[in-house]
Amino acid sequence: MNRGKEWDWMDNKKDLLICFGTRPEWLKVKPLLNEIDNYKLLFTGQHKDLLKDIEVDYRIEIGDKTNRLDQIISDCLMQFPDGDFDVLVHGDTVSAFACALAAFSRKLKIIHLEAGLRSYDLKQPYPEEGYRQMISRIADINFPPTSISAQNLFNEKADGLSYVVGNSVLDNLI
């Protein structure tokens, strides 16, 4: 399903910027930290109480109206750190979309964890289904959790590479 492209993480010397802003995102990316040597953490601030237990390299200060999606996206675009790194986003949150969009605008490689999950109804769940589809379209590498989600990406002709990787939370529990 990779449309003839290849990617080798071991040959990559760039830092991986791991973006998260919610507790569910953190729980799903945390197991990866033991497997990756060269990473930096970017916190987007939806669940601010997370920071008391986690040291991050970058923090995006979102406005007081944190329930406004446009404000969160604007703050992420304006405050996204400069650097030559690959950017990992997880799932379908507004912070994942905003960080992917910021990376895309800076021509950075985007890696989408938990890609390809679909309802195919842009209004359910809203706005997450739209974020899922848009992130997968601009991602260079998609990591779907199942073969069904990988097939969704293939059917949509998503240009990025696709590797079925399972669910990091379930893998961590086993």
Q: PLM ranges: what are they?
A:
Residues 2-5, 44, 48, 63, ...:
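A nucleotide-sugar donor-handling region in carbohydrate enzymes
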Residues 112-126, 140:
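A short, histidine- and acid-enriched strand-loop-helix "catalytic/donor-clamping" loop
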Residues 16-79:
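Glycosyltransferase specificity loop/lid
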Residues 25-30, 93-99, 150:
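Short glycine/serine/threonine-rich phosphate/pyrophosphate-binding segments
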Residues 88-106:
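An aromatic- and histidine-rich active-site surface loop
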Residues 4-22:
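Nucleotide-activated donor-dependent transferases that construct or modify glycoconjugates
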Residues 11, 79-85:
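Glycine-rich phosphate-binding loop signature in dinucleotide/nucleotide-binding domains
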